[in-house]
A protein has these predicted regions:
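Glycine-rich acetyl-CoA-binding "A-motif" of GNAT/NAT acetyltransferases
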Residues: 39-45, 102, 115
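Conserved acetyl-CoA-binding loop-helix of GNAT-fold acetyltransferases
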Residues: 60-63, 69-82, 105-109
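Short amphipathic alpha-helix that is part of the acyltransferase structural core
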Residues: 1-15, 38, 118
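Active-site rim helix/loop that mediates acceptor-substrate recognition in acyltransferases
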Residues: 12-40
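Conserved GNAT acetyl-CoA-binding A-motif
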Residues: 77, 84-96
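Conserved beta-strand-loop-alpha-helix junction that forms the acyl-donor binding cleft
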Residues: 68, 94-103, 122-125
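Conserved beta-strand in the GNAT
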Residues: 42-50, 57-62
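Conserved acetyl-CoA binding element of GNAT-fold acetyltransferases
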Residues: 54-65, 94, 122
Length: 125
């Protein structure tokens, strides 16, 4: 999954997010992840998210270019959303790079909107 995500510049990965880190995330009970495969068994899409109390997050979503605009991303988001809703998540959030216009259009089409009056603060641990 990590190798698949790293193929796409628009998927935000920090240097510290390596395969070991991803394996640690995947075994957590609060993680939701799905893969989409083509008929040859190759990964063509992936989503990774998590649950934080009553909120959920999509950390990464990627779809191979030749499979975009075919509903793969939408189905991956719906699967992750269903997992979260089933365990009581009431709201989902995600981060999109300011320069990722296609990503902004995709997430808007999925019903997400930019919050007003909020700013994200982060720090490395």
């Amino acid at each position: 999954m990590e190798r698949f995500f790293r193929q796409f510049d628009e998927v935000s990965f920090c240097e510290w997010q390596d395969a070991k880190c991803l394996r640690g995330v995947l075994i957590q009970k609060t993680t939701t992840s799905y893969l989409a495969f083509d008929i040859a068994g190759e990964i063509v899409g992936a989503v990774l998210g998590g649950m934080l109390g009553s909120r959920g997050t999509i950390n990464h979503l990627a779809v191979s270019p030749r499979y975009r605009s075919q509903g793969v991303g939408q189905r991956l988001v719906e699967a992750a959303s269903s997992d979260m809703k089933r365990v009581g998540v009431l709201r989902m959030f995600l981060f999109v790079d300011d320069a990722n216009l296609a990503g902004k259009r995709f997430w808007t089409a999925q019903g997400f909107c930019e919050p007003h009056g909020e700013r994200t603060f982060e720090r490395d641990l």
